Swiss-Prot record:
This is Uncharacterized protein YhfL. The keyword Transmembrane helix applies. It is found in: Membrane. It is a single-pass membrane protein. The chain crosses the membrane at residues 7-24. It comes from the Bacteria. InterPro entries: DUF4223 (IPR025318). One of its GO terms (cellular component) is membrane. It comes from Escherichia coli (strain K12). Keywords: Membrane, Transmembrane, Transmembrane helix.
Length: 55
């Protein structure tokens, strides 16, 4: 029974994380990045991988 609870917990965490992913492209459609939980905390966004956000 304990093993079942662990498997169910891992399954619930994975189901939650897979629903919180996405893909963003800039207006010119020449640069994009993926995020895991929220676009604002994406590493590519933080380091400016697509340049200034105004573009």
């Amino acid at each position: 029974m304990n093993k079942f609870i662990k498997v169910a917990l891992v399954g619930a965490v994975l189901a939650t994380l897979t629903a919180c992913t996405g893909h963003i492209e800039n207006r010119d459609k020449n640069c994009s990045y993926d995020y895991l939980l929220h676009p604002a905390i994406s590493i590519s966004k933080i380091i400016g991988g697509c340049g200034p956000t105004a573009q």
